[in-house]
């Protein structure tokens, strides 16, 4: 189908592709995405859910993805969570910024700008995509705050690695 073709193009071109699934509530968008992802082999699939307005956790879906890769659980003490994050990042600066974005460390946007967080996520995704293609699934993107939408757009425009952004 179209999703498979788009992922194939991302893999062949070695660059990011953005794919948005539109439809009325209850029409089966989530099921379509889940079935597509379940059928993938030799692809890293990470998913994160955007929270409803008022939750004010801008990068929550990114945090879920980063925690999955690093093997961080919500019960981990901060020191242990950050050690796991550092172990899976090639750069300490990337680990620091992802720690902020993931809420492992305190004070995200006040201390670090959106551009810095975008740079860190970009570097992290390119590192992840070195061995095999990556699919990032942003669930409930209609709840996303502007900085997250800007980040998705940044990744779509600038990542030079086999990446499918699925919203």
Where are the language model's segments positioned?
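Key residue(s) within conserved catalytic/signature motifs
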Residues: 1-167
């Amino acid at each position: 189908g179209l999703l498979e073709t788009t992922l194939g193009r991302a893999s062949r071109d070695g660059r990011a592709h953005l794919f948005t699934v539109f439809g009325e509530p209850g029409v089966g968008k989530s099921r379509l995405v889940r079935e597509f992802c379940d059928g993938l082999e030799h692809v890293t699939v990470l998913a994160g859910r955007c929270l409803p307005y008022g939750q004010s956790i801008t990068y929550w879906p990114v945090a879920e993805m980063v925690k999955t890769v690093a093997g961080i659980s919500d019960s981990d003490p901060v020191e242990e969570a950050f050690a796991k994050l550092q172990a899976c990042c090639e750069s300490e600066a990337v680990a620091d910024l992802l720690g902020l974005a993931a809420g492992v460390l305190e004070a995200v946007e006040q201390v670090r700008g959106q551009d810095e967080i975008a740079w860190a996520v970009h570097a992290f995704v390119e590192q992840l995509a070195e061995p095999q293609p990556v699919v990032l699934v942003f669930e409930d993107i209609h709840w996303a705050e502007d900085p997250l939408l800007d980040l998705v757009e940044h990744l779509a425009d600038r990542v030079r690695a086999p990446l499918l952004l699925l919203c």
